[in-house]
Amino acid sequence: MSNFVFYDFETSSSNKQWGQIIEIGAILTDDDLNELDRFESRSRLSPGIIPEAMALIVTNTSPKKLKTTNLSHYEMIRQFVEKLKDWGKVTFIGWNNIEFDQIFLRNTLFQNLEYPFNSTTNGNNEGDILNLARAANL
């Protein structure tokens, strides 16, 4: 079986085309859900990005905090891409990730000149716990 990556993004906006991923949390597990590794990173807001007020409330952050983080958005994405390469073939799991996080990730990877379809190619898969919960509620 495959290893799993459980992940979540905090973003500056609900707009998947114009917002920015500001924080990444990801945990690699084996197929018995034993934690093997983790990735946690936060970046400062890129110039020209204006965060939505509701996004600041949901992510429990402030404009000041978004400006004072040392890591640039590009550096954070590069580190995440390298971590994913280290982890190899995985199944990406999240809550509402197919409709939100994966679209944000694809747009972000494309904007940073990285391959945008890593979660569905090269032996990788994706799953959405929200869809599982919806199916269980039928």
How would you label these PLM feature ranges?
Residues S2-T108, S119-T120:
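Conserved non-catalytic scaffold segment of RNase H-like nuclease domains
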Residues F110-E114:
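Short, surface-exposed basic-aromatic patches at helix termini and helix-loop junctions that form
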Residues N124-L138:
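Short alpha-helix plus adjacent loop in nuclease-associated cores
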